[in-house]
Amino acid sequence: MKALSKLKAEEGIWMTDVPEPEVGHNDLLIKIRKTAICGTDVHIYNWDEWSQKTIPVPMVVGHEYVGEVVGIGQEVKGFNIGDRVSGEGHITCGHCRNCRGGRTHLCRNTTGVGVNRPGCFAEYLVIPAFNAFKIPDNISDDLASIFDPFGNAVHTALSFDLVGEDVLVSGAGPIGVMAAAVAKHVGARHVVITDVNEYRLELARKMGVTRAVNVAKESLTDVMAELGMTEGFDVGLEMSGAPPAFRTMLDTMNHGGRIAMLGIPPADMSIDWTKVIFKGLFIKGIYGREMFETWYKMAALIQSGLDLSPIITHRFSIDDFQKGFDAMRSGQSGKVILSWD
């Protein structure tokens, strides 16, 4: 079958031919319809330090997808041939304390689809049936293919009660923009997003944020004054991994504020911890999606009217995958969809 693989320990992704995966007793075989390119896939393409330490070569990459069930393991119940599914990209062990306690998103033995095991940038994918999620009929293939990153946004945004709160989102990448849209949709008062990439800030404006602030041109404190905010932000969603953005967030949080961190900062990032202590801030790390509460919330948000369509900016045939990666690497894109049909 056709697949996009990391074949060499150097920059690039290559189209290749690999054997179709075998279906285990507890697995589903999924015929891929559409996939989306993640920032992780770009890291793998660039062959950065993280990729060199993490990715075995060769490896079929990709973990954002929608497809159709075409094979079912003999022990699997609850799925039928023809079901349209996406799936959780974190494969968990099922036997550690967190897994047994219903906190599978915190499994210490997690392996990643397209990172530690073959991914979805292929004509067929095998995953445990436990990880598959049926897509409601009124959700499009395009939207279903971005459920994985949308789940990161939902998990981060819904970590805290947002109704009536003032929310700061730092980082207007696709996940940050979707998190801001979720916050606005569920009843936050002011949702302010910051970045220095004007293209992506414009995407955030299309998604309905209160203010999209280019911090290279505009002061966040001036924007807060313009909005009549006198006590700081109640909730911070840190999506950038950029130390200056996180320091600004700490400066502008209200006392007792709550921060959810999805962005991955440098290991040696320094902050003024007195602001965390004396403001009584609560900081929560976010990894992946809650299984599977986040997935049900994702579907419900879209079915209740949340419009994510502006975040999908580019669509290509899989044969034009290089154009898709070029768009992602340019920084002038939202989500990029690759069609396998």
UniProtKB/Swiss-Prot annotation:
It is found in: Cytoplasm. Its cofactor is Zn(2+). Pfam families: ADH_N (PF08240), ADH_zinc_N (PF00107). Keywords: Cytoplasm, Metal-binding, NAD, Oxidoreductase, Zinc. The record marks D148 as: Important for catalytic activity for the proton relay mechanism but does not participate directly in the coordination of zinc atom. Binds 2 Zn(2+) ions per subunit. Zn(2+) 2 binds at C93, C96, C99, C107. It comes from the Bacteria. GO terms for cellular component: cytoplasm. Signal peptide: none annotated. The active site is at T40 (charge relay system), H43 (charge relay system). Its main location: cytoplasm. One of its GO terms (molecular function) is zinc ion binding. Zn(2+) 1 binds at C38, H63, E64. SMART domains: PKS_ER. One of its GO terms (biological process) is L-threonine catabolic process to glycine. It catalyses: L-threonine + NAD(+) = (2S)-2-amino-3-oxobutanoate + NADH + H(+). Catalyzes the NAD(+)-dependent oxidation of L-threonine to 2-amino-3-ketobutyrate. Homotetramer. Belongs to the zinc-containing alcohol dehydrogenase family. This is L-threonine 3-dehydrogenase. The lineage of its organism: Bacteria, Pseudomonadati, Pseudomonadota, Gammaproteobacteria, Enterobacterales.
